[in-house]
Structure formats: C-alpha cells, structure tokens
Amino acid sequence: MALPFVVVLPLLIVVAAGVYYIYNEVIRFMSKSLVRNKVVVITDAVSGVGTECAHLFHKGGARLILGGTNWDKLESLYDSLTSDADPRETFAPKLVILDFSDMDSMEDVVSEVLECYGCVDLLICNSSMKLKAPIQSVSLEMDRNIMDVNYFGPSALAKGVLPTMISRRSGHILLVNSIQGRLAVPFRSSYAASKHAAQAFFDCLRAEVEEYGIVVSTISHTFIDASHHPLAAGEPAPKTNALAAFIASQLTHGVRPSVLANEILQTVNRKRKEVVLAHPIPRVALCLRSFCPPFLFAVLAAGVKDSVLTEQM
C-alpha cells in the first residue's frame, strides 16, 4: 500500500503546481486586459517600482502618463517601453515633469496631466523621500521637504484629478505608501510622520468619494531598498540592540519592485482598498501596536537606550 502512495504523491504535487501556475497565468492575463485603454498616471516613473509598473501597464494596453523629475530618464524609459512594443496593441506614453518638492508647480502639472487625455482613470502615487537620522539632527526645512514629497505632493495631485473623476463617477486613486505609515520606528521620525499623514488623508478620501464610484487604495510595504536611507550631515548611523535591530531590519527588508508592481496591478483590478505587503515580523509588530503597545514601545525604547549607551562608551 505504501508504494502507490509514494508514486501518487509526487504526481499530485506536480498536478497541483501545474494548476496553480495556470491559474496565476490566467489571472495575470485578465489583469492586464482590464487596464486596456485606461488612462494611468504613474508618479516617480523612473524609480524601480515606477519602471516596473510602467512596463506592466504598458504591456496591458494602458494609456500611460509618466511623471518624474529628470527628463532624460523619462525619455530613456519611453524608449525602453516603445522599442519592442506593438503600436497596434500599445500606446506611446506621455511624459510630464513632476516634482513634488516644488509645490508651486502642482497646479500647472495637474493641467498638463489632464490635457493629455482629458481625464484620468487611475492615479498611482508612487513618489517617496526617505531619511534615517535622530530627531534632534533633522532640520525643520528637511521635515518640510519630506512632507512635500510624501504627503502634500500626492494629496495635491489627488485633489487635482478628483473633479474629473467625480464628474465621470469613475476612477481609482492608489497610494504606494509604507509600513511606516502604520508603524513608526526610531530614527525615521520625519519619514514615518509623512507616511502616517498620507495614510490618514487617503483613508479619509476613500470614505468621502465612495458614493461617486471612485476607489481609493493604499499599499503598505516594507522598503524597496533599505540601503538608501541618507543620514543627516555629520551624523553616524545609530546603533541598536540585537532585538531592536532585528525588528528594524525586518521592517526595512524590502520587497522586489517587480513583486510590488504585480501587487499594484492586482489591487487595481480587484479594487482592494488596503493591502499590507510585508514579512511576518512587521505584521506581528502591527498587531502588538494595536493589542499590546507597551511591549512594543519597551522594545523600541530599549533599542534607542542601548544605542545611546554604546555611543557614550
């Protein structure tokens, strides 16, 4: 009796894997077909996630409007999208200079975006500015810059395209946020504050525009690349104890841009309102923040205290 089971089990595993693969391919194909002809705005399109999204939505037949701060990089992305594309199946992307650190230009940017096709079906707010430093070393000017890029910029752009979505009673606004929009860790005060603000804004927006058939989604992910957190001038990297360092490393253990881009596509097509894309440790930390905050606070504070003692030795 054991022999048939040993033979059948691998076959069942292979069949199950095959069915799972086919299912994923069908879902992926359907996801791409659902964005065909849709006007999609992607901010910071030249970043890793932005580029992956651009390729994914372009292959799906979306009418892309790509925003970024560097025109040469935007043109390079344009070339990579159109070089091997079938003009019968895809649309040439529109390029727009979009710099959230220049809030005075936002009104003109919104006008330029709307002039491309007259409307926006999907707005993907992907821009982000990161910083890792002790609170006392961060200037108020830096705080404002981070708030501009991470909060005021996305909210201003969302407000700009909102009237056309309301008039059409259709549209989707998606914020690519961070897990730190829901859970703050030491030495990232400005970044976490801006992400919390963005999370709150889009949560409010979701409730206010649902009656118009507009979907608002937020994706809270761990960092794409934890090695790119600039320190304040002259400040050494803060040290933490083992437990706090482990939690921080898990919170900043990034996902691949391609994985996040696929999650964005699925979120759009399934009209999910909130997605957490994180490893188990950040998820546990979120639960602790809600159900046992004193323990989480103690762990984070112990890490900070340990770093101070280490620097004094």
What are these regions (language model features)?
Residues 158, 194:
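Active-site helix of classical SDR
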Residues 39, 46-47:
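Conserved glycine-rich cofactor-binding loop
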Residues 84-104:
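Rossmann-fold cofactor-recognition segment
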